[in-house]
Amino acid sequence: MGFHNIVIGSLDPMTEAGKTYTDWLDKGYAASMDYLKRDPQKRVEPAQALAGSRSVIIASVSYYSEPVAVPPPVAGRVARYAVGLDYHPTIRAKLREYAALIEEEVGRPFLRKPYTDDVALYEQALSARHGLGFVGKNSLILGPQLSGSYNFIAELFVDLELEPDVPYQGTCGKCFRCGDKCPTVAIKDGALVDSNLCISFLTIENKEGIDPNLRPLLGEWVFGCDICQEVCPYNSKPVTTPWPEFRPESGIGHYMDLLDLLTIKDDVDFRRRFEKSPVRRPKRRGLLRNGLVVLGNHLAYGHIETEKIVSAVATFAAEQDDSMLVEHAAWALNQCGESSARVALQSIADAHAGASIGPTLARYTEESSFGVPKPVSSSGERKDGAL
């Protein structure tokens, strides 16, 4: 089937993992992801995934790939898991094929249900309990047999009685590169990630505006983030995905053309462009918000295409009635010290002077707040090393 690793798991409750999950929730680290807060006990009881199941087969496959094309002149980076096609239907189909092979082997039909990141289940803890790897400080499953952390994890619940695999005994040791390099300091003690600060949450699951203090730290990430994986020693020799569905040529690739992104007309156009891509998750509004933040960061760098960016952002804002997107567009222009950006920003402020967002836009046009860029590196880190 092309899976890199397959282990067998029991359906016993994950008591210790439940304590970790509750601690994560109690600290408010789930942010606005209310679906993760509902019935937390259910997430550490694998048996609830399929009534009548007796075992779970846990599989992993790498999604890693390197860029194969030159990025557009004005680009935003896409997390590696999303460069190809949506993994949910692809992996579920493979699990069904695998189940059919097992059925031939056992000589009888059996109850089964495939899942991949779409069931109320603490997947990392279950995978670690049965030898797929261990939960690293960035909360991802790590281990030499995985060749790093760039892996999709999936489960096939069955009513077959199978012998479970034992845990893998591994740790990160004293290494904390993921936490040290995280631009927003989202990685906390105890292998807990504060979603309120995580770039992946901010650009994917977050439905609201992005905190202006965090925007410069996104760097060039328009969808997701791989920084904590890129710096991890376990990822020093990643295995390229063997599945063509997850390769960049099958999807949008590693970079997104941000000027083209601003031309998306409506939700219908958005769905057409990204029909089978994971980047549909934040919807049109969220992806445009992300693009405006990255464009602002490009302007802060002094991008070679500054005038094109200013013109595109100004045109976009002039056609918008969504106050969140207008504010993010104004913020982006405010990162630029060019006179053209000042003119464009003033035009936006005048057009929305009577709206609730008017005072915010007016503040951006003030001399004290205009043209004071916050330089960041491509990874999202402030160049002065401060938050």
Per-range role (PLM):
Residues 295, 299-302, 333, 337, ...:
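Alpha-solenoid repeat junctions
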Residues 269-273, 303-318, 338-349:
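Amphipathic alpha-helical scaffolding segments comprising HEAT/armadillo-like alpha-solenoid repeats
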Residues 252-266, 272-285, 289-303, 315:
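Alpha-helical adaptor scaffolds
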Residues 370, 374-375, 379:
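Intrinsically disordered, low-complexity segments enriched in serine/proline and basic residues
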Residues 1-171, 351-353, 360, 386:
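Auxiliary alpha/beta "docking" domains used to position bulky ligands
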Residues 3, 13, 177-200, 207, ...:
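Iron-sulfur cluster-binding cysteine motifs and their immediate structural context
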